[in-house]
Amino acid sequence: MPITWTISPAERLVTVKADGPVTLKNAEEYLDALVVNDAMPYRKLVDCTAMQPIASDGEMMQLGGRMRAYVATLEGGPLAFVVTRPDVLDYVKRYINLVMGATRPVKIFQTVDEARRWLDAQKV
């Protein structure tokens, strides 16, 4: 599976690993799991170091619509992305721009350790 995740209610933390080609459908499955498990307010560490983003402009707009609906109705927790490649950085920045208006902190890091330290300092 291109996106794998672990939801830890005890830590109020979701750890995500995107590996290989990631499609809109993959992203939607992950988001659905967050909603079903009431994990939207949890801290999220998203490791994109091995990700190959595959999304058309239309698919990004679809994802944006979904994200704006979530922002309007659900509280989102702090979000830390781990990115090491320029093509993935562009994709992640587009994703972040889709959820402008969300009040949660979002930051991009180059290592999982940096991201985890930052997330550990965030209140949820």
Report each predicted region and the residues it spans:
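Amphipathic, Lys/Arg-enriched alpha-helical "gate/interface" segment within cytosolic domains
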Residues: 1-124
